Structures are given as C-alpha cells and as structure tokens.
Amino acid sequence: MHFAGIVAIALATGATAYDLPENLKQIYEKHKSGKCSKELQGGYDNGHSHDGKSFSYCGDIPNAIYLHSSKNGGQYADMDIDCDGANRHAGKCSNDHSGQGETRWKDEVQKLGIDDLDANIHPYVVFGNENDDGDDPEFDPRKHGMEPLSVMAVVCNKKLFYGIWGDTNGHTATGEASLSMAELCFPEEDPSGDSGHEPNDVLYIGFTGKEAVPGKSADWKADSTESFEESIKELGDKLVAGLKA
C-alpha cells in the first residue's frame, strides 16, 4: 500500500482509537507473561499451526474473560478476519471464502432493528467455541456470565477499541474479529477477508453481567464503524474503569 493510502486510512480511523487508561496498561502487561491461573477452558489454537493448542479462555481478571497462551513467555491472541453476517461479500470481504450467511446472535440482532451484523460496519469479536463434531472442547461464555451482543474491549496496536460479542467459533480456532474491527486496529496492514493480523498481541476482554449489554442504546443502524463504536464508548469506558489490575 502506498504511504498516502496508509495516511488516509489512519486519518479515517484515528478518531476512534482510544488511549489505554492506566489500569488497562497494567492489566495488559501483568497478565501477558506466565500462565493463566484460573483457566476456564483450554485446548484451543489460533487458527494456525504454530503454537499448537496452547490457548485458553482465562478468568484471572475479575468480572472478565480473556484469551491467553503460555507459549513464548506468555501471549494473547491474533486477529483473523470474520466476514459472517449481512453483506458478507461486500468490500474487502469479497475474498473471504469461509464466511457464513449469518452470525451467532442473528435472532437477537433482529430485535434491535437490523437483519444481522455487518462485518464491514459492526466491530464484533468472535468469542467462544461450539462443539461442532463432539470431539472439540466447548466453551460457552454465557455459562460464565457473558451476554450475547455485550460490549467487549480490544487492546491492539497499543490502543483501545470497543466492539461487541457478535459471533462464536467452531472447532478449536480462536482470535478472530470482524473486518471492521481489524480495520480499526491495524489499518496499516490493509486487512481483508483473506488477510488478518498474525502476531499474538491482541487482548480481547469480555465482560460478565447484564450491565455490559448496550441494547437499544447502541447505534445498530450506523452507516460507519466509527459511529457504531462511538455509540458504545460510554458503556465501554465504564466497564474498563471497573477492571482491577
């Protein structure tokens, strides 16, 4: 990508990149190294062959769930691209050959006035794993207090972004988010349906409790990622402020 293109993307997304508050900086550094002491479910990979099935859902942060691996001295997750939902072949999702026609919480989304989440607009995180064939470890975040379509915090590129829990994974893959979330996090990498962010340095934080659900206060009909993220920022800030390092 030409430098001018990178600058244009950065300017377009910069308004929604939030600085890390001090407690989140401490959380990121503290929980990255070492092992997860409160493993909720392990046996997952990052969708690639390296690092094996070393990833787990961890409950070491009170009132939150996050992904972690003890490999390489401790690491978080990568960001593969999900294009499921509405307009799944639109824009830079056009080269995604693994997308599905709907997201996990489509029925709930329709109650909020839209047909389904749009990976090109809604910055959602793929979190939790369905037991597709009976042999894979299942993890349902709802059993640990998370609610569908609740706000999630994503620490990437040394910045904070807000998204929602919008989909689940099959089998053992973890570390996935919608195209629009990847564009917020890594505009300089020009993500697409077939190209994500490989380093395991992304911290996905899901919040437990019904208070993490924005409901109708979120701008589900937003025509841009920035507008949607701004509509959940106040709630996201409140949830992040409550995290203890």
Swiss-Prot record:
Matches recorded under InterPro entries: Chitosanase_fungal (IPR009939)
Signal peptide span: 1-17
Any single Pfam family the record assigns to this protein: Glyco_hydro_75
Keyword Signal: yes
Keyword Signal set for record: yes
EC number annotated for this UniProt entry: 3.2.1.132
Gene Ontology cellular-component terms listed: extracellular region
Origin superkingdom: Eukaryota
Compartment(s) of residence: Secreted
GO biological process: polysaccharide catabolic process
Key words of the record: Carbohydrate metabolism, Glycosidase, Hydrolase, Polysaccharide degradation, Secreted, Signal
The reaction(s) this protein catalyses: Endohydrolysis of beta-(1->4)-linkages between D-glucosamine residues in a partly acetylated chitosan
MF-aspect GO terms: chitosanase activity
PANTHER family for the chain: ENDO-CHITOSANASE
Function: Chitosanase catalyzing the endo-type cleavage of chitosan, the deacylated form of chitin. Chitosanase may be crucial in the degradation of the deacetylated portion of chitin in the fungal cell wall. Chitoolisaccharides produced by the hydrolysis of partially N-acetylated chitosan are known to have many biological activities, including antibacterial activity, immune-enhancing effects, and elicitor activity.
Family, per entry: Belongs to the glycosyl hydrolase 75 family.
Name of the protein this chain belongs to: Endo-chitosanase
Organism of derivation: Aspergillus oryzae (strain ATCC 42149 / RIB 40) (Yellow koji mold)
